[in-house]
UniProtKB/Swiss-Prot annotation:
Residues 217-299 form a coiled coil. It comes from Bos taurus. Belongs to the FAM76 family. Residues 161-182 have a biased composition (Polar residues). This is Protein FAM76A. The gene is FAM76A.
Length: 307
């Protein structure tokens, strides 16, 4: 019985071939938790839910420092502290001020003083380097798939030619070799047409060489368009939130104003009632005082006339 290996997410056991190479995930976990790019720092991470579009580190920074600003060097929306992202800040401390990237022309490429760190002798920024490596990896995988498929077809045709035997074997062998030779250049020509962009490269190095610069540019432009769309979406969300807050403040102000008016009307009404009561009481007291003074006068006049 073949050995089984556990998925790093669901911990169920599968054959080694059924797990992914990097994360060691099964097919269901790869679909449920795909590897996506963080909206802010642009690093790849395993998405836990479809609504979560930022990595855990950026989520913690958002809670601590609030929404980030675009970095003044690389324009990535990851400047939580100051005007520079953490990657550019650390690179600037380590390698000095940034230079212009030879791919995207932004002032965000740091010279590490080592030609081995450069991409085909070019000084590229972090995003352009990732795009280049991603395109290069895809071409390598396509080349590997092409070579494996050609070997499989060659092996099948050799087995068929062995079974046929005799003169038929020789004729089939010549046909198979000629067909394979015709097939491989056709498939190679597709990749060679992709990689030849005015530069001269050898056929063996065409797929691994930097002739895929235009693909890197296209990938970079797509990433920039996606970044701009996300920035626009975020700004629209910020505008909507601000409009919502303004509406809530207006509603709260109107409510408080109506409450104050009602309170003032109630106080005015109460004051009027108290004033009327005091005036009525004052009139009653005046009547009583007049009656007392009148009775005193009558008593005095009676006392004078009695002798």
């Amino acid at each position: 019985m073949a050995a089984l290996y556990a998925c790093t997410k669901c911990h169920q056991r599968f054959p080694f071939e059924a797990l992914s190479q990097g994360q060691q995930l099964c097919k269901e976990c790869r679909i449920a938790h795909p590897v996506v790019k963080c909206t802010y720092c642009r690093t790849e991470y395993q998405q836990e839910s479809k609504t979560n579009t930022i990595c855990k580190k950026c989520a913690q920074n958002v809670q601590l420092y609030g929404t980030p600003k675009p970095c003044q060097y690389c324009n990535i929306i990851a400047a939580f502290i100051g005007n520079k992202c953490q990657r550019c800040t650390n690179s600037e401390k380590k390698y000095g001020p940034p230079y212009s990237c030879e791919q995207c022309k932004q002032q965000c490429a740091f010279d590490r003083k080592d030609d081995r760190k450069k991409v085909d002798g070019k000084l590229l920024c972090w995003l352009c380097t990732l795009s280049y490596k991603r395109v290069l990896q895809k071409t390598k995988e396509q080349r590997k798939h092409l070579s494996s498929s050609s070997r499989a077809s060659h092996h099948e045709k050799e087995q068929y030619s062995r079974l046929s035997g005799g003169s038929h074997y020789n004729s089939q062998k010549t046909l198979s070799t000629s067909s394979i030779q015709n097939e491989i250049p056709k498939k190679k020509s597709k990749f060679e047409s992709i990689t030849t962009n005015g530069d001269s490269f050898s056929p063996d190095l065409a797929l691994d060489s930097p002739g895929t610069d235009h693909f890197v540019i296209i990938a970079q432009l797509k990433e920039e368009v996606a970044t701009l769309k996300k920035m626009l979406h975020q700004k629209d969300q910020m505008i909507l939130e601000k409009e919502k807050k303004i509406t809530e403040l207006k509603a709260d102000f109107q409510y408080q104003e109506s409450q104050m008016r009602a309170k003032m009307n109630q106080m005015e009404k109460t004051h009027k009632e108290v004033t009327e009561q005091l005036q009525a009481k004052n009139r009653e007291l005046l009547k009583q005082a007049a009656a007392l003074s009148k009775s005193k006068k009558s008593e005095k006049s009676g006392a004078i006339t009695s002798p």
